[in-house]
């Protein structure tokens, strides 16, 4: 898929999405043990931390999903004398730069997230300077149909972003909720949201001032 192509094809199951996210993460955080054996990949998929939702996949489920992903050039099996290992090919298949690959991996593992959450959770994976850098890369992914921008809903303070490579029915639900939320905003007032934004801006300014004084 080139930079100008979109993700009209190649939707993946929740198991396949979890596998891709786990491979991307372990490539960045555990290069000494990457590519992963099937057993190591199952453990990575079923981690109880940094996973939303937590899953309980079997070796059979992961193995079957890996073969399906391999047929779409999203994973590759490396045969070894001691053990076979699997690697991700998402960056090559979708022609992603490293920053985009990490963001896709985070969204594969944890679903919709705010810019600040992506910045915090990527600190061991990629060196983003700020949320503006993340937003720039997300906008490029959105333009190619690989990610979605989700306006904040009631009770939320920030917009969220998620990948667009999952089950089409789930994506349709997200888009429908997004459209409904947008309609509600255009017909109603945003006084409370504007006040929250003003308070957040004031807090950010105070934090920046405090950092200057401490420096």
Swiss-Prot record:
SUPFAM superfamilies, per the entry:
Winged helix' DNA-binding domain
Q: Pfam families of this UniProt entry?
A: DUF480
Q: List the disulfide bonds.
A: none
- From what superkingdom does this record's organism come? Bacteria
InterPro entries tied to this protein = DUF480, WH-like_DNA-bd_sf, WH_DNA-bd_sf
Against HAMAP family, the record matches this protein to: UPF0502
Q: Which family does it belong to?
A: Belongs to the UPF0502 family.
Per its record, how is this protein called by name?
Answer: UPF0502 protein PputW619_3184
């Amino acid at each position: 898929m080139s930079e100008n192509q979109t993700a009209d094809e190649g939707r993946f199951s929740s198991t396949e999405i979890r596998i891709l996210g786990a491979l991307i993460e372990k490539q960045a955080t555990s290069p000494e043990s990457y590519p992963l054996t099937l057993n190591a990949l199952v453990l990575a998929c079923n981690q109880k931390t940094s996973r939303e939702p937590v899953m309980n996949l079997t070796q059979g489920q992961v193995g079957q999903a890996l073969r399906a992903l391999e047929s779409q050039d999203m994973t590759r099996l490396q045969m070894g004398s001691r053990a076979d290992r699997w690697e991700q090919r998402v960056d090559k298949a979708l022609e992603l730069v490293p920053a985009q690959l990490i963001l896709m991996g985070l969204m594969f593992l944890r679903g919709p997230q705010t810019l600040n959450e992506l910045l915090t959770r990527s600190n061991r994976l990629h060196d983003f300077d700020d949320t503006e850098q993340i937003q720039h890369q997300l906008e490029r992914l959105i333009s190619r149909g690989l990610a979605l921008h989700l306006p904040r809903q009631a009770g939320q303070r920030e917009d969220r972003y998620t990948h667009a490579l999952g089950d089409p029915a789930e994506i349709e639900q997200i888009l429908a909720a997004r459209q409904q939320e947008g309609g509600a905003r255009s017909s109603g007032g945003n006084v409370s949201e504007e006040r929250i934004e003003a308070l957040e801006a004031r807090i950010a300014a105070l934090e920046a001032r405090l950092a200057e004084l401490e420096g």
